[in-house]
Regions:
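Surface-exposed beta-loop interaction hotspot
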Residues: 116-190
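Long, contiguous binding/interaction regions
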Residues: 5, 172-179, 289-293
Length: 293
């Protein structure tokens, strides 16, 4: 028997799914949306929050809520009152979170039109529009940070004792978080110590140049007893983290936060090269940066 006849023939099954190209990776998925900073914060650092929006007229002008988390990390849910909820902290993701949120929203809209409620699942590998393509950018509300996952339930529904107990347990497990008054993107949280995390839409290299200038001058802090401790990189944005003086609340640091934000804005406009001290400060800042997505 010849070599050719001894070769194993590979049969192609008719049931074998067709090749699906992967969803292209997008480093900064929510870029271009007016609420980019809030969406990144909800995805990465805020445990419980709600942001309301509306689709374009082409997609029905439907109102919906983007929320931090849904039961078991599902991507979408339709409450018994018909309200559509789309989750950001989900179990499965493609390389483009904007694609995933839009796919979940469209799936929920279809389920709603079919008279379905409850949790909705999607396959994030399937092609779909991006969030920027299907929402009205002018229709977003202000984000609301809430104490628990009460948004899972119809607000007109009387909760059972089991539901109330579950919410109480969830509330006990949630890291206390609050927006620093008057400063976009700054969020206070209480863990083993109190911290402020600053989500900035400024280009990362420019932001670290600005922070280096402030650090070298001793101004990269939020009041007495605070210090810069590092940074995250998430959804294409840098998120500097400041440890606060013991017991300091969001309100306590509001004035210092305002001064820091103003100083960062001024430093972002600076075009002179970094000094030697500023370069050393920048190296220290970058060495403490961690990518979480």
């Amino acid at each position: 028997m010849g070599k050719a006849s001894r070769r194993k023939k590979v049969a192609v099954s008719a049931d074998q799914p067709a090749y699906r190209p992967p969803i292209p990776f997008v480093e900064r998925p929510f870029e271009g949306l007016p609420n980019e900073v809030e969406l990144v914060a909800m995805r990465e650092i805020i445990p419980c929050a709600v942001l309301s929006g509306r689709t374009t007229e082409e997609h029905g002008g439907a109102e919906f809520d983007i929320v931090t988390l849904l039961p078991d990390g599902h991507p979408a849910m339709i409450r018994p009152d018909g309200r559509i909820l789309v989750g950001l902290q989900t179990r499965s993701n493609s390389g483009d979170l904007s694609h995933d949120v839009a796919a979940a929203l469209l799936a929920a809209l279809q389920a709603q039109s079919d008279g379905v409620d409850g949790v909705i699942d999607i396959d994030v590998r399937e092609p779909a529009p991006r969030l920027q393509d299907i929402v009205d950018p002018k229709a977003f509300s202000d984000m609301e940070i809430v104490a628990d996952f009460g948004y899972w339930f119809d607000p007109n529904q009387e909760l059972t004792p089991e539901m109330r107990d579950a919410l109480e347990q969830n509330r006990a497990d949630v890291v206390p978080t609050a927006a620093v008054p008057g400063i976009e993107g700054m969020y206070w949280c209480e863990m083993n110590r109190n911290f402020v995390r600053y989500v900035s839409a400024a280009p990362e290299h420019k932001l670290f140049d600005a922070l280096a200038r402030l650090q070298a001058a001793g101004n990269a802090r939020l009041g007495e007893g605070s210090r810069f401790v590092g940074a995250f990189r998430a959804c294409g944005l840098a998120i500097p983290v400041f440890e606060l003086a013991e017991g300091a609340s969001a309100e306590d640091v509001a004035a210092d936060a305002k001064a820091l934000a103003e100083n960062v804005e001024k430093a972002l406009k600076e075009t002179t090269p970094l000094s030697a001290d500023e370069r050393r400060a920048r190296q220290g800042l970058v060495s403490r940066q961690v990518t979480i997505r």
